[in-house]
Amino acid sequence: MLLTFAPIFLLISSIVAAPTLQLQRKGLEWDYQNDKIRGVNLGGWFVLEPYITPSLFSVWSNGEDDLNTPVDEYHYTQKLGKETALSRLEAHWSSWYTEADFAQMKYLGINAVRIPIGYWAFQLLDNDPYVQGQVKYLDQALEWCRNNGLYAWVDLHGAPGSQNGFDNSGLRDSYKFQDDDDVKVTLEVLKTIGAKYGGSDYEDVVIGIELLNEPLGPVLDMDGLRQFYQDGYSEIRNNDGVESYNAIIIHDAFQQTDHYWDNFMQVSGGYWNVVVDHHHYQVFDQAALELLIEDHIKTACNWGTTHKDEAHWNIVGEWSSALTDCAKWLNGVGHGARWSGNYDNCPYIDSCLSYTDLSGWTDEYKTNVRKYTEAQLDAWEQVGGWFFWCWKTESAPEWDFQALTNAGLIPQPLNDRQYPNQCGY
C-alpha cells in the first residue's frame, strides 16, 4: 500500500490503441472489457497492518515510544508465541468483518471486494512464527459475497522473504522474495489458491486471483519478476490438468514508464484474461504532500488518461482519499509523519492533530477530500474500475470508506458529483 507518485506535469506520450478484447476460452463471470468494478479492500483482516488496527499492537506501546511494539505480523506472532497469537488472531478474524459489513457494502453500491491474504495462511516455512486458520474465514467471506451479490479478488498480499519490505507483506524491511526457495514456495501457494478458488466451486464469486501484491520493482530483478508472473499464471491456468478460466491479476511493480506492461503476457503469446493492477497514492512522497489540491486532482486525472490507453485490461486496485500521511503508524511502527516533519527529516507542513479525527476536519479540508475523491472515481472509471483502500479502519479516517461515506465525503450514490467534470474527459 505504498509508493506511487508521478510528476503531475509529465506529458503523456506513447499513445497506443485502446485495449482490445482479450481471448476468452470461456465467458468470465465479470466483463472486464465493459463493466466497472466499484470495490473495497478488506485490509487489516488476514494480513495485519498496525495503522488499520492499532489496538492489536498498542498493548506494547508505553505512550512515549514504540521500541517494544512489533512492526508487522511476523514480529507480532513471534513476540506472542503461537498459542497466544492464535487465540488473539482467531478473535480478530472472527470479529473484524461480519456479514453486516458485506450487506452494507452492497447497499452503498459496492460490487466487489479485494481480499488480501499472506502465503502463511496456506504454507509455513521452517521456523515461521506465523499462525494459520485464516482460510476458514476467507471461505466464509466468499460465502458472504455470494449471499450479498458481491464478487471477489483473492490477493496474495505477502510472499516468503517479502516482495517489498512493507509491513503489509507480513515482514518489514526484508526483500528476499526472489531467493530460489521463496519463489518456489510462493508458486506452490499460488497452485493451492488456484486449485481451490480458481475452479468451478467459486467461479460465481471469485473473478480474479492476484499473483502478488506490490512487488517492489525498483529493488527487484525485473526479469525474474516477469518469469515469476509467467510461472504463476501457469500454476493457476493448468492445475493438475484442470484448466482455470479466472482472470489473472499482475501488479505493475511500480514501474513508472507508461505502457510498461503492454507487450507482456499478451494474447499472441498464449496468455488470456490478464489484468494489470495499479495502486495510486499521493502521500508517500514529500513533493506530493506539498501539492495544491488542484495539482493532486490533475495527477489523478492524468493517470486515468494514461491507463485508458494501455493494452491490457487494468484496474486501480488500491487508492484512498488521503491528502496527508498523518494516520498513526501509516508509515510503519516507529515512524512519524512527513506532514508533521517527524519522518526522515522531512520539512514541516502542518500539525497532524486536526487530521486524525473527522471531527477536527475543517470545511475547506472536507471540500478538498470530496473533490479529490470524485476526481479519482472519474479517473479510475476511465478503465476497469477500482478498489478503495480500505473498507474500514479503527482510527484512520482518510483511509476508511465507511467513515468517509457516513461523513458525506464519498458520493452516494457513487456516481453523484458535487464537482463534476474535474478531469475534462
From Swiss-Prot:
The active site is at E214, K328. Pfam families: Cellulase. One of its GO terms (biological process) is glucan catabolic process. One of its GO terms (molecular function) is glucan exo-1,3-beta-glucosidase activity. Residues 1-17 form the signal peptide. Gene3D superfamilies: Glycosidases. Keywords: Cell wall biogenesis/degradation, Disulfide bond, Glycosidase, Hydrolase, Secreted, Signal, Zymogen. PROSITE patterns: GLYCOSYL_HYDROL_F5. Its main location: secreted. It is found in: Secreted. SUPFAM superfamilies: (Trans)glycosidases. Its EC number is 3.2.1.58. It comes from the Eukaryota. Disulfide bonds join C301-C423, C326-C352. One of its GO terms (cellular component) is cell surface. It catalyses: Successive hydrolysis of beta-D-glucose units from the non-reducing ends of (1->3)-beta-D-glucans, releasing alpha-glucose. Belongs to the glycosyl hydrolase 5 (cellulase A) family. Beta-glucanases participate in the metabolism of beta-glucan, the main structural component of the cell wall. It could also function biosynthetically as a transglycosylase. This is Glucan 1,3-beta-glucosidase. The gene is EXG1.
